[in-house]
Amino acid sequence: MSLRLSGGRKLQSPPGSTARPTPARVRQAVMNMLSADLPGCSWLDLCCGSGVMACEAIQRGARRVVAVDQDRRMAATARGNLALVAGAQTPPANVTVVQQDILRWLRQGVSACGLEAALEEGASLAGFDLIYADPPYASGLYPQICEAITGGGWLNAGGLLLLECASAQKPALPPGWSVVKERRYGTSTVLMLKPTEDPTT
C-alpha cells in the first residue's frame, strides 16, 4: 500500500501489513481542525501504525513527537517515515518511536516512561499538548487509554485528546472527560476530548 502525506510526500507501509491507515480525507480534516494548536506543540501518537498522523503533525509545525505501537514492523516503518519527515524541517523535529504495549507504557506515567534521553538539552520532561489515539476500532481500548492518560499525567494543561473510532460504534468514555468536538467522516469518527478538570492538578 502506498501512503502519501497531504503535501505529496510518499511514505512507506509495512510489507504485507493489514493495518488500517487513517484516510487522507480524515488526516486533512484533523490537521485543519488543529491548525492553531500545531505550531510548536508536543504530539503523542498512540497505536501509530506507519506514523502517518505524526508525520502530518510534523509538517504543520509539531516540534516534539513520540509515536508508540506494539507491533515491531509498524514501529520500524514509523521510525523510518518520521525520520524522513522530521529531517526535512528546519530545525528538525524531535522524534521518538517506542515499540511497546500501549497500556503498559502509558500506565508507567510520563515521569517513568524512559523518554528522558530523547529530550533536547536543557528541556524538562513534560506531558503532551496533543494526543492522538487510533487503536483497532473493535479493540475496546478507548476507555482504558483515557484512564491511563489521566492517571499518568500525559496531557498538559489545556491539551486535547483525539480518538479515532468507528462511526457505527463510538466508545463509552470514562468519567473525567468531555467531548469538545465530534466529526464524522464516513465509517470513521474523530472525537476531540478535554479533561473536565485540569490534568496537572
How should each PLM-predicted stretch be described?
Residues 1-201:
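Class I S-adenosyl-L-methionine-dependent methyltransferase catalytic core
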